[in-house]
Amino acid sequence: MASELAMSGSDLPTSPLAMEYVNDFDLMKFEVKKEPVETDRIISQCGRLIAGGSLSSTPMSTPCSSVPPSPSFSAPSPGSGTDQKTHLEDYYWMTGYPQQLNPEALGFSPEDAVEALINSSHHPLPGAFDGYARGQQLAAAAGGSVPAEEMGSAAAVVSAVIAAAAAQGGAPHYHHHHHHPHHGGGGGGGGHPHGAAPGSAPPSSASSSAAGSGGGGGGGGGGAGGLHHPHHGGGGGGGGLHFDDRFSDEQLVTMSMRELNRQLRGVSKEEVIRLKQKRRTLKNRGYAQSCRFKRVQQRHVLESEKNQLLQQVEHLKQEISRLVRERDAYKEKYEKLVSNGFRENGSSSDNPSSPEFFMYPRESSTTVM
C-alpha cells in the first residue's frame, strides 16, 4: 500500500491547507481495499448514472452503494467530460459517509468546513448519493470561478477528514461535547470553553480533535449525566447544615417534642425525620451514659461498704482473740488457786478455814464458757 501511495504521490493535492489537513492523520493505518479494474469500471458507470439522475437518490443494496471503494489517486476514468467531473468521480466513494458540500464552492472558511463536517457526521443526510449529485451541480454552476485543481484538493481534504473521523468513531462524541461544553472534560474529550467561538480553533487542532476524541469522548458523555444537576443533592445538605447549626445536641435532648414540632413547621419531611432520629439517638446515648454512671457509682458504694465490713470483721476477730487469751489466763489462774487451796487445807476439817473457799465455785461458774 505504501508503494502504491508513493507512486501516486504526483496526484496528491498541492494546496498547503489541504496538505495540513492530510498530515494530521496517519493514512498508513487505513486499509485500502484492492478491487479489480473491471469492478472499478462498473462502479464508475454506476456513479455516472446516479449523477445523471437515472437512479433513485436513496441508497440501495447494489455493488456501488453497499461497500464504497477505497479512495484512488489513479488516472481519470475514461468517458469523463471535464476535469472537475473527473475529480468528483474519483472521490465519489466519500458519499458512503455523511455527505458534505464543497466548502470552497460555497465560499466557506476552513473552520466553517470542519464545523460542517462534524455537524453532518452526527446527523447524516437521508440520501447516500444526494451529496454527489449536488456536488456535480454546484461544480457545474461554479465552474467558471473555481479551478478544477482546487475543487479536487478540497474533495480530497473532505474525504480524508471523513474517513479518519469514521475510523476513529470520534465525530459523534465531539459533536456532543461541542453542544454541551459545560459538561466538563472529565472523560478527556476536547470541548470548547464557554467563551470560545466554535470555529475559533486552528484548522489542525480542530481536525485532530475531531479524529482523536473518540477514546475519551465516551467517558465525557458518561460523566455528563452525573454533572447535569449537581445542585439538586446540595439543597438538602445545605438545609441540614442550617438546622444542625440551629439546634445543638443539648437543645435537641432537652426540648420537648411539642416545642420541636413547632420549630420544624414548614421543613421537609426528610429533614424532620432526620432531626427526630438524631434526637432519639442522643436521648438513647444519654440514657445509656446515665445508666452506666449509676452502675459505676453503685459499684463504688458497694465496694466501700464491703471494705468497711471487712475492717469490722478484722476488728471483731482481734477482739475475739484477745478475749480468748484472757479466758485462758483466768482459767490457768483458777486451776492454780484450786490446787493450792486443797493442799493447804488437806485433812484438817471439812469446813473452810478461809473465805477463798467460797470464791472458787462462784468463780468457776462464771468463767466457764
UniProtKB/Swiss-Prot annotation:
Protein localization: Host nucleus
Domain bZIP: 274-337
Recorded GO CC terms: host cell nucleus
Xref: Pfam families: bZIP_Maf, Maf_N
GO molecular function: DNA-binding transcription factor activity, RNA polymerase II-specific; RNA polymerase II cis-regulatory region sequence-specific DNA binding
SUPFAM superfamilies: A DNA-binding domain in eukaryotic transcription factors (SSF47454), Leucine zipper domain (SSF57959)
Biased composition (Gly residues): 184-193, 212-226
The keyword Transcription regulation belongs to this UniProt entry's keyword annotation: yes
Sequence segments annotated as region (Basic motif): 274-299
Spans annotated as Disordered: 57-85, 169-243, 341-369
Region of interest (Leucine-zipper), ranges: 302-323
Swiss-Prot/TrEMBL keywords: DNA-binding, Host nucleus, Oncogene, Transcription, Transcription regulation
Comp. bias regions, Low complexity: 194-211
UniProt xrefs under PROSITE patterns: BZIP
Polar residues compositional bias, start-end: 345-354
Record flagged with keyword DNA damage: no
Ranges annotated as biased composition (Basic residues): 173-183
Cystine pairs: none
Role, per record: Might be a transcriptional trans-activator.
Similarity remark: Belongs to the bZIP family. Maf subfamily.
Miscellaneous field: This protein is synthesized as an Env-Maf polyprotein.
Protein's name according to its UniProt entry: Transforming protein Maf
Organism from which the protein derives: Avian musculoaponeurotic fibrosarcoma virus AS42
Annotated gene: V-MAF
